[in-house]
Curated annotation (Swiss-Prot):
Highest taxon in the source lineage: Eukaryota
Cytoplasmic side: 1-8, 102-284
Name this polypeptide is given: Uncharacterized membrane protein YNL320W
Record key words, sorted: Membrane, Mitochondrion, Transmembrane, Transmembrane helix
Extracellular face residues: 26-80
Any one GO MF annotation of this record: palmitoyl-(protein) hydrolase activity
Keyword Transmembrane helix: yes
Lineage: Eukaryota, Fungi, Dikarya, Ascomycota, Saccharomycotina
Family: To S.pombe bem46 and M.tuberculosis Rv2307c.
Residue spans crossing the bilayer: 9-25, 81-101
Other remarks in the entry: Present with 259 molecules/cell in log phase SD medium.
Membrane protein topology class: Multi-pass membrane protein
Length: 284
């Protein structure tokens, strides 16, 4: 009897693992990029809901995908912040953050929806999002307004991985980088989100090797690392290792004892730290 129960248990465990592995391989893009969650593809709030003047742009990538972007110019600014979003929601979720950078810090702001997010065309993938980033940097570097200003990257979670891709590939165009709760790689996050799949991480084709890209960033670019120590998705040691790996001679890390993955941004002192960084490095 005990043997039969054990066989049933083992059979169920094998079946569960097989299903989980198949899900990881075939549906990982929907897991990594939940652009559909909470109706984020159906409605996108706009900056005019807070009285922020903006220009809506359509950028076309190398593979002919149309991206929605918002250009918020501040004529008195000396810097532009490029906001790089996490993997859920849409750019409408960032209006309050736009407001802080634009009104409180006096910066120009540029933000765009990745392919497959918000009102942008296409389906998200690592390869595709990197083409999106190439397109945006090409636009900013040739734009008559933004090309005259310093460029600061602000990336949260997946947005941080995107920021590191940009900072490593376009190191001469990036003047500062702010990272929040960013991972070493997707493969190194899987064991913490899906423990049963820790032996199958090589099946993950969405890699985002932030750890590997960090070494290609400029040693002269200022970096600010913001880490929530109660992050339940990205283990805090990922941020600590990114900080330690960062070649910049001008880097700082701040850790928030009560910050989880999504609420580090509202922890006491978060925006004061960012303001001080921007002032100290001459961005505002």
């Amino acid at each position: 009897m005990l043997w039969k129960v054990s066989k049933m248990f083992l059979g169920g465990l094998v079946a569960l693992t097989t299903i989980s592995v198949a899900t990881l391989y075939h549906y990982q893009n929907r897991l990594v990029y939940p652009s559909w969650a909470q109706g984020a593809r159906n409605h996108v709030d706009t900056p005019d809901s807070r009285g922020i003047p903006y220009e809506k742009l359509t950028l076309i990538t190398q593979d002919h995908i149309k991206l929605e972007a918002w250009d918020i110019k501040n004529e008195n600014s000396t810097s532009t912040v490029l906001i790089l979003c996490p993997n859920a929601g849409n750019i409408g979720y960032f209006i309050l953050i736009i407001d802080i950078f634009y009104r409180q810090f006096g910066m120009s702001v540029f933000i765009y929806s990745y392919r497959g997010y918000g009102n942008s065309e296409g389906s998200p993938s690592e390869k595709g999002l990197k083409l999106d980033a190439d397109c945006v940097i090409s636009h900013l570097s040739t734009d008559s307004f933004h090309s005259k200003r310093k460029l600061v990257l602000y990336g949260r979670s997946l947005g941080g991985a995107n920021a590191l891709y940009i900072a490593s590939k376009f190191r001469d165009l990036c003047d500062g980088v702010i990272l929040e709760n960013t991972f070493l790689s997707i493969r190194k996050v899987i064991p913490y989100i899906f423990p049963l799949l820790k032996r199958f991480t090589l099946l993950c084709h969405e890699i985002w090797n932030s750890e590997g890209l960090m070494g290609s960033c400029s040693s002269e670019t200022p970096f600010l690392f913001l880490s929530g120590l109660k992050d339940e998705i990205v283990p805090p040691f990922h941020m600590r290792k990114l900080y330690e790996t960062c070649p910049s001679s001008n880097k700082k890390i701040f850790e928030f004892p009560l910050g989880s993955h999504n609420d580090t941004i509202i922890q006491d002192g978060y925006w004061d730290i960012i303001r001080d960084f921007l002032i100290e490095k001459g961005f505002i």
